[in-house]
């Protein structure tokens, strides 16, 4: 299967739709923000007209106040693959959320359910004795502790939760996970200045399209500004503006700045995929890129066994 990824504003959406039109394929979104309802403009969702041209999966599937894990994404992605293949079409993954991509190509462990009472107890211990949870993690699973930043309390609590409930080291459990299947990752690239210009243009277009009104609507619906869904670039800055903390010009510039920083982090993350195919959109034409990726998708379709029912959906 094929994953098309790249930093925000690089051109994933338009390119993926063009490829799907050529190949009678459908898109499975790999975006941790586009899955939320009522958050269209700020997340850069494909328009309704684009979604009529090509069917998209895993967009608008949960409300902003619903919990949605990487593991749930993996399960939903598998169901989407089954549905698309059953109807004789090709699934094309597109999006820029690195953890979601990892859950597909490397697998993810989510063997124990969330235990809110246990988490509350752990956080109380941390409040009473700052650093105690980090010390616990270093003692029970030093391998995992080396991979979790000392100030990352959220992941530390999750690791301890897994250990307490499973009686096994999280690092050992993670070694047992398997990828969903065989994936070819295609990374779209643009020269930095060109990418930043596209980001600045996109942010301007978002505000012109009514981002502030979209944020007002979310507030009217009763959604807290502290929700994970609303801790999204574009929304947090807009909320600050609506609260009188930023003027409009400063808000727009801050969204541009934060989006550029986010794109830089995405580029660094994608370097992890050593076997990925890089398509440079700054040096090749849009048409050539569509044709090149379409050929890759077709070759994958012809040689991957899962299209013939040989795919494992564990």
Swiss-Prot record:
Annotated transmembrane regions: none
Residue span of region Interaction with substrate tRNA: 31-34
Its EC number(s): 2.5.1.75
Site (Interaction with substrate tRNA): 97
InterPro entries registered for this protein in UniProt: Dimethylallyltransferase, IPT, P-loop_NTPase
Record: residues binding ATP: 6-13
Top enzyme category: transferase
Subunit details: Monomer.
Function: Catalyzes the transfer of a dimethylallyl group onto the adenine at position 37 in tRNAs that read codons beginning with uridine, leading to the formation of N6-(dimethylallyl)adenosine (i(6)A).
Recorded family membership: Belongs to the IPP transferase family.
Protein name according to UniProt: tRNA dimethylallyltransferase
The organism of origin for this protein: Pseudothermotoga lettingae (strain ATCC BAA-301 / DSM 14385 / NBRC 107922 / TMO)
């Amino acid at each position: 299967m094929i994953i098309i990824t790249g930093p925000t504003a690089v051109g994933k959406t338009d390119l993926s739709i063009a490829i799907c039109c050529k190949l009678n394929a459908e898109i499975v979104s790999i975006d941790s923000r586009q899955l939320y309802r009522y958050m269209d403009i700020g997340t850069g969702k494909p328009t309704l007209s684009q979604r009529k041209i090509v069917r998209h999966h895993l967009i608008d599937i949960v409300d902003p106040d619903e919990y949605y894990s990487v593991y749930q994404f993996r399960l939903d992605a598998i169901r989407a693959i089954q549905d698309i293949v059953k109807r004789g079409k090709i699934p094309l993954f597109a999006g820029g959320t690195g953890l979601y991509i990892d859950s597909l190509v490397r697998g993810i462990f989510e063997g124990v359910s969330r235990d809110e009472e246990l988490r509350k107890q752990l956080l109380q211990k941390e409040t009473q004795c700052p650093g105690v949870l980090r010390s616990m993690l270093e003692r029970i699973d030093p391998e995992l502790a080396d991979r979790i930043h000392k100030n990352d309390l959220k992941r530390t609590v999750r690791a301890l939760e897994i250990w307490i409930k499973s009686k096994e080291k999280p690092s050992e459990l993670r070694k047992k996970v398997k990828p969903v299947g065989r994936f070819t990752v295609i990374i779209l690239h643009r020269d930095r200045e060109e990418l930043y210009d596209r980001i600045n243009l996109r942010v301007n277009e978002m505000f012109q399209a009514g981002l502030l009104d979209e944020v007002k609507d979310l507030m009217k619906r009763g959604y807290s500004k502290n929700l994970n869904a609303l801790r999204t670039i574009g929304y947090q800055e807009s909320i600050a503006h609506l609260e009188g903390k930023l003027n409009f010009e400063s808000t727009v510039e801050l969204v541009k700045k934060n989006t550029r920083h986010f794109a830089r982090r995405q580029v660094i993350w994608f370097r992890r995929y050593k076997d990925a195919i890089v398509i440079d959109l700054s040096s090749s034409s849009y048409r050539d890129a569509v044709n090149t990726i379409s050929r890759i998708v077709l070759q994958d379709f012809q040689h991957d066994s899962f299209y013939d029912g040989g795919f494992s959906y564990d």
